[in-house]
Amino acid sequence: YDRCTVGVVTGIDPEATVPEFDIVGAEQMYSVLRTQVDVVLPDGAAVLDASDPLVAKMASLCDGDVVFYDTGAGSQVVDAHLATGRRAVLVRGGRIVLATGERGVPVAELSRLEIGSNGEPRLDDLLAAIATSWALGIGADLIRTGIETLCTVRSESNETVVA
């Protein structure tokens, strides 16, 4: 394909190589994976893992918007991005939040989700999927329903409810 609406890069494994094509290090893998960001349309978005410095560096290559995601709190990359009024999916106060600038809309309580066990998605993978959905224009209510459908949800009484 020539261009795309949403391009996603979830990480660069520094050990990943493709020696038969002379890709023998992280910087060379960066050059390969950056093409996914290079082809994002001006009205599209790149979804990037803010916790991976090489992936975060790709933001400047995008013709469209950038939606960062990060499992940690206080990421300088995310904080600077939000300070410009842009979007990020992050964990804040035990919640998964869709943040735009200083505003945030919670879409899930982490304490109510089974994450990273028994075949459930890992948190970083879940955040990437949420960020991709949001980049495609899907609203918070539908994203919330998707999370509850994908993950096992604990009720208020801590009983496991399979959604």
Predicted segments, located by residue:
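Beta-strand->loop->alpha-helix junctions that form or flank phosphate-binding loops
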Residues: G64-V91, E120, G146-E148, N158-T160
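Gly/charged, well-structured mid-domain segments that form the phosphate/adenylate-handling core
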Residues: N118, S133-A163
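Fold-independent oxyanion-binding glycine-rich loops
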Residues: T10-I12, D49-S51, M58, Y69-G72, ...
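Short, small-residue alpha-helix embedded
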Residues: D125-A135
